[in-house]
């Protein structure tokens, strides 16, 4: 999805959900449910077809042709869904440009789409007459200048950085990031997205939404952002895009005489490199 990113891993917690369900839900045994949780590589279409045939052929007597056809249809639909989301994002951007109104890129992980988790924040923003866009509706419109100050190796993160990079140069867009403290990797994204935006003189807002049913605090933060945006427009403060790329200093042999390396204690795998 992002060829120039360092890698394209998926969330390790999400990939372990099936194991968690298998080991903790007694109903699977008592109700005699056939619970299948094979590990599948979704980034390799041919490998996925092969693995699904291995898993499904014996139990459901499906042929390789049937599985191949189903996988082809699934990937076509996935591509179409992504295209639909991107087209809608471009449509909203065109509307904002035509009307001069403001839009907010509400960045969140896939599970933040669930109303039980986001607590109606998208609807709250809409109630102020502001358009809401997701990060994957605009991330295709920008490429982040690299290297960043983090290892950009998670697909969602790459999408998030690209969306922030696009928003920093568009004066009609603001960014609000939904953050769940249960996700350790989000601690990396909040700092990096903030860095991308604030370097260009933009406002960064993060809403920590874990276990909070009262929208009062979120409402105050959103109103504060809207007020700040109005003040900036009144004073004609324009964004000044700055590249988030950093220039790494290479440690040379000559530096060994006068420099000291501070190396934090890490696990053995970190020291392989």
Q: What name fits each language-model region?
A:
Residues 1-273:
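An N-terminal assembly and electron-transfer interface module characteristic of large anaerobic redox
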């Amino acid at each position: 999805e992002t060829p120039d990113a360092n890698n394209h891993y998926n969330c390790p917690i999400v990939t372990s959900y099936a194991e968690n369900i298998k080991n903790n839900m007694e109903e699977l045994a008592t109700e005699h449910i056939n619970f299948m949780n094979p590990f599948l590589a979704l980034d390799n279409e041919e490998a996925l077809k092969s693995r699904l045939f291995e898993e499904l052929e014996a139990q459901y007597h499906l042929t390789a042709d049937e599985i191949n056809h189903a996988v082809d249809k699934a990937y076509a639909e996935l591509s179409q869904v992504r295209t639909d989301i991107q087209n809608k994002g471009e449509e909203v951007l065109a509307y904002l440009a035509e009307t001069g109104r403001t839009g907010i890129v509400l960045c969140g992980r896939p599970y933040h789409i669930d109303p039980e988790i986001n607590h109606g924040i998208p609807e709250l923003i809409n109630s102020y007459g502001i358009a809401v866009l997701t990060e994957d509706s605009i991330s295709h419109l920008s490429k982040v200048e690299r290297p960043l100050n983090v290892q950009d190796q998670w697909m969602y993160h790459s999408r998030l950085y690209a969306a922030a990079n696009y928003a920093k140069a568009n004066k009609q867009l603001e960014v609000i990031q939904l953050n769940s403290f249960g996700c350790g990797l989000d601690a990396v994204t909040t700092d990096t997205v903030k860095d991308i935006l604030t370097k260009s003189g933009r406002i960064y807002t993060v809403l920590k939404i874990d276990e909070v049913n009262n929208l009062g605090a979120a409402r105050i933060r959103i109103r504060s952002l809207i007020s700040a945006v109005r003040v900036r427009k009144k004073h004609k403060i324009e964004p000044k895009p700055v590249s988030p790329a950093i220039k790494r200093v290479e440690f040379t042999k000559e530096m060994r005489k006068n420099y000291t390396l501070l190396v934090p204690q890490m696990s053995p795998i970190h020291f392989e490199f």
